């Protein structure tokens, strides 16, 4: 029979490898009503269910096996490598850079990383490669910070397992509108997938569809109505930081979806002030090929968000001096 992961790739278009494996983890790919795994072999008569965004499927009537029309050529940005070994690299993603390619053809981190490896002679984009280097943890387009990239299939598989079993912890810096309390906050999260928007609630719903979220907040500095905060994710869900802080009445500065529109306009901030600054690996099992990362901490030394906060503080002080 055909390997399930290969079948899914054959009927989708522009579906990133990292999202493919995330879909397996999140039970969005099923065989005969049960959770599928990439290694499953499927045969005639099997019922395959794919709960995947429509954008990754060819238009009705098109042949999925055919390649899509070429995208506009795009020079990829130079990759900033924070850490690298033979299996993975930890990259810095600036604000506005996509993680994966989309139909706009805009520059993206995956293609930039692939180009970087090709220039080093570690990857042949024109060869008969079954595996294309991919990223393991996605950041929203407007979020900057650390992203883990896999150079080979085993690294991608095992890093996804590390993430799935919560053996990797991430910390963020953010600037909030309003000064939050420091502490651990718990709430209930619900995702409207159609509109890609999250709502946060104090209690579980009757149908128990909501999922619990836990967010750690540590206020590092304040400047008037703004706070520079360190955020720790005990759980990691879509838009968790942005939506949870908005629910607490202290939204992320520059957040168009959940934020304070007036303050965004007043400060001229057009994207969310959020940066993934630190990745910590816990005790990884010996059978995992990335076991050697156990206990390793990777940090972003000079996050742009700190300079952004310094600018807000300076502007506030100048306004006080003038008055």
Name what the model sees in each region.
Residues 1-323:
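RNA pseudouridine synthases
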């Amino acid at each position: 029979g055909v390997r399930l992961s290969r079948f899914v790739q054959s009927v989708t278009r522009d579906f990133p490898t990292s999202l493919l494996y995330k879909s397996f983890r999140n039970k969005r790919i099923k065989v005969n009503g049960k959770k599928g795994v990439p290694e499953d072999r499927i045969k005639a008569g099997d019922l395959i269910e794919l709960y995947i965004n429509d954008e990754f499927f060819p238009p009705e009537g098109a042949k999925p096996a055919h390649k899509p029309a070429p995208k506009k050529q795009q020079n990829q940005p130079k990759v900033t490598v924070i850490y690298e070994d033979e299996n993975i690299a930890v990259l810095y993603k600036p604000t506005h850079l996509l993680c994966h390619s989309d139909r706009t053809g805009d520059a993206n981190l995956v293609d930039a990383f692939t180009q970087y490896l090709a220039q080093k002679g570690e990857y042949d984009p024109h060869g008969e490669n079954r595996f294309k280097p991919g990223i393991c943890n996605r950041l929203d387009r407007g979020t900057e910070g650390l992203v883990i990239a896999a150079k080979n299939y085993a690294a991608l598989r095992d890093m996804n397992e590390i993430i799935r079993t919560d053996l990797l912890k991430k910390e963020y810096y953010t600037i909030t509108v309003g000064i939050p309390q420091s502490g651990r906050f718990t709430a209930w999260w619900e995702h409207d997938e159609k509109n890609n928007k999250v709502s946060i609630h104090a209690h579980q719903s009757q149908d128990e569809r909501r999922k619990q979220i836990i967010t750690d907040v540590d206020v590092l500095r304040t400047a008037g109505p703004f706070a520079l905060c360190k955020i720790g994710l005990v759980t990691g869900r879509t838009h968790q930081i942005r939506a949870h802080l908005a629910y607490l009445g202290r939204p992320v500065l520059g957040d168009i979806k959940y934020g304070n529109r007036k303050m965004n306009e007043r400060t001229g901030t057009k994207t969310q002030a959020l940066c993934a600054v630190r990745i910590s690996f816990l005790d990884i099992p010996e059978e995992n090929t990335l076991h050697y990362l156990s206990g390793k901490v990777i940090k972003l030394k000079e996050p742009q968000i700190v300079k952004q906060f310094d600018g807000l503080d300076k502007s506030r002080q100048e306004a006080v001096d003038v008055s």
